[in-house]
Amino acid sequence: MFLKSPPPLILASTSRYRKELLERLRLAFSCMAPGADETPQLGEDPKTLVARLARAKAAAVAAQQPNAWVIGSDQMAVRLDEAGTESTLGKPGTEMRCIEQLQSCSGRTIVFLTAVAVVRQEGNTLFEFVDTTRVRFRVLDQATIERYVAKERPLDCAGGFKSEGLGITLCESIDSADPSALIGLPLIRLSAALRSAGFELP
């Protein structure tokens, strides 16, 4: 049952990519910086970390806006080497670091973990999950990497590439249940949660 006057909807993020994704659902919403502590806990694995951070971001904003539904999200890229050892890849921040990250991704599989939590009234969680997307990079030479970074400058993206842009040309394959997850917000399962909360979609 859809609500005639649904409560406010807030995206607990300052990411323009997540904002653009949520705009696809054509719902009225606002954005707030979550201000949550993102320090990893000792021994915390990547999947547990992104789930906790998504929940913490949503809860931090919900504490300030108790009547609103709040969406929190977090993403991490994890590189798998030939022995199966995991290493995390953050947002490169600089051109040199971006080039180094893509060099380390060449010919390898990168797992993107995208967590979502939808909460209301100071942490009363309605819905939370972690989407897993596997990206297999083709073998990349130095010139290809440098051209890509110069053209797209994906310095604020986990893993140092944008699948929605030229980054798709670096891929050999992408295995995902939700193509929007890799960009930063899995809309298929998020829209299901929002429908459960009473938002009219479509």
Which residue ranges define each predicted feature?
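Anionic-ligand binding patches
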Residues: 3-9, 43-202
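A short beta-strand-loop structural module common to alpha/beta enzyme folds
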Residues: 30-38
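A generic short alpha-helical patch detector that favors 3-5-residue windows
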Residues: 27-28, 162
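N-terminal beta1-alpha1 ligand-phosphate binding loop
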Residues: 2-27
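Short loop/helix-cap segments at secondary-structure boundaries that form the rim of catalytic
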Residues: 20-24, 41, 63-64
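Cofactor-binding loop segments of dinucleotide-utilizing enzymes, especially the Rossmann-like FAD-
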Residues: 14, 34, 121
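Flexible, glycine-rich phosphate/dinucleotide-binding loops
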Residues: 18, 38-40, 125
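Residue-level detector of anion-binding/catalytic polar loops
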Residues: 28-30, 200
